[in-house]
């Protein structure tokens, strides 16, 4: 299938105009704007028609007279499939000042993708488990800033640094599914939503940790809020809890901890991502560093579902979890009692949600230029040492 995806862009180099051409301060100033569409057809060929394939799950005949492997329909045809289309507006500014010692770029964008290609589940009575359709719209809006500073530059000493930062906000504009009761802080709202897949195929996370809700950001963490550990003198134990259990908040106050008490417990989408670079040269010695970081994103740390709880007899746990577990003679408001059960939906709590922000020294290079003025063999001789992923600063307790 074919479609038409137009685009255009224009730019105005303001620094070439007569009123800026002779400026001693502004060296370059360019304003940019653009609009365009692009299509995504990231699906298998012939997705609009039924495809045939062999199946070893259904066999005819016997080992005596031979076994025939049939050719079956693999999917339901959908002749109404169309392109997933992304439309984007861009506005930007390029500039440099002070003899190009300070330069930068600012970009604003507004992107919307409609008619998302998705496999949705259908009743198995149809003979198939899913069908490919166009469903849902998603938008991304953001700003990106890039700056470079050439501070000092002479024969003996050079120093420059730069950085970039990007802010992006994603919104699920439409999911294409009927609205239903969705609970936030114990209150039901009519919202269109669906749950994500089980992380780790259900082996660690035994229920979905992410939810997609129309009007919200993508992939929000959805589960139970907690408030420490039940103590021996507590009289407000809920739904069979005993001292030493995690105190799960009964959002709707019905005395039962169930799915109606789930709410938003985290957001994996960062507030911003950023990078830094520094370059230093003193005579023949040079040092360069490259940092990258993410700020404001949450992570569901699945390690805390296993080694973070002293459950059962056949797995290791963190020493802090075991030695500081709640005990009648040594109560804790951080770690539950030994044997506390975290299986099922109630395992997805804010106790496993951690701040995933980090700053990483991604690359460090130290070099030295040896003098080669009298050499007939070399035009330049530089020896350097490079290290990657050298340090990471983060509060996240899982693997980096």
What is each model feature region?
Residues 1, 14, 65-74, 120-130, ...:
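Flexible, solvent-exposed coil segments and beta strand-coil junctions
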Residues 231-233, 241, 294-382, 387-388:
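Extracytoplasmic gating/loop element in the C-terminal half of outer-membrane beta-barrel translocons
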Residues 6-14, 29-35, 89-97, 102-110, ...:
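Membrane-embedded beta-strands that build the outer-membrane beta-barrel scaffold
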Residues 21-85, 103, 107-138:
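Solvent-exposed loop/turn elements at secondary-structure boundaries
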Residues 58-103, 131-154, 204, 215, ...:
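Outer-membrane beta-barrel signature, preferentially recognizing the C-terminal barrel domain
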Residues 22-24, 37, 41-51, 116-120, ...:
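Outer-membrane beta-barrel and related beta-rich outer-membrane complex signature
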């Amino acid at each position: 299938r074919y479609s038409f995806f137009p685009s255009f862009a224009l730019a105005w180099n303001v620094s070439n105009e007569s009123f800026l051409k002779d400026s001693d301060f502004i060296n370059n100033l360019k304003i940019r704007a653009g609009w365009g569409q692009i299509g995504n057809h990231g699906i298998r060929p012939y997705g609009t028609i039924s495809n045939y394939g062999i199946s070893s799950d259904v066999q005819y005949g016997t080992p005596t007279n031979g076994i025939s492997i049939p050719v079956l329909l693999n999917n339901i045809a959908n002749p109404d499939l169309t392109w997933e289309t992304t439309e984007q507006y861009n506005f930007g500014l390029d500039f440099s000042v002070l003899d190009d010692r300070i330069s930068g770029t600012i970009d604003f964008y507004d992107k919307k993708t409609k008619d998302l290609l998705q496999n949705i589940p259908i009743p198995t009575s149809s003979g198939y488990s899913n069908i490919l359709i166009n469903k849902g719209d998603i938008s991304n809006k953001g700003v990106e800033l890039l700056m470079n500073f050439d501070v000092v530059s002479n024969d003996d000493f050079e120093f420059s640094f730069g950085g970039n930062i990007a802010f992006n906000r994603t919104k699920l504009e439409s999911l294409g599914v009927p609205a239903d009761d969705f609970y936030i802080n114990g209150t039901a709202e009519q919202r269109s939503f669906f749950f994500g897949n089980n992380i780790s195929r259900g082996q660690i996370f035994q229920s979905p940790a992410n939810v997609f809700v129309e009007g919200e950001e993508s992939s929000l963490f959805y589960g139970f809020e907690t408030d420490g550990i039940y103590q021996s003198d507590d009289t407000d134990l809920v739904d069979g809890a005993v001292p030493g259990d995690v105190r799960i908040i009964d959002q709707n106050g019905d005395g039962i901890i169930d799915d109606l008490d789930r709410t938003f417990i985290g957001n994996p989408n960062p507030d911003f991502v950023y990078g830094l670079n520094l370059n230093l040269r003193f005579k023949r010695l040079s040092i360069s560093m490259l940092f990258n970081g993410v700020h404001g994103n949450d992570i569901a740390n699945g390690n805390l579902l296993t080694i973070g709880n002293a459950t059962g007899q056949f797995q290791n746990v963190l020493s802090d979890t075991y030695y500081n577990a709640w005990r009648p003679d040594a109560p804790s408001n951080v770690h539950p009692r030994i044997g506390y059960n975290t299986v099922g939906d109630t395992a997805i709590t804010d106790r496993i949600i951690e701040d995933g922000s980090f700053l990483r020294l991604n690359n460090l290079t130290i070099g030295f230029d040896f003098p080669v003025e009298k050499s007939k063999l070399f035009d330049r001789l530089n020896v350097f040492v490079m290290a990657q992923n050298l340090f990471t600063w983060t509060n996240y307790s899982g693997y980096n």
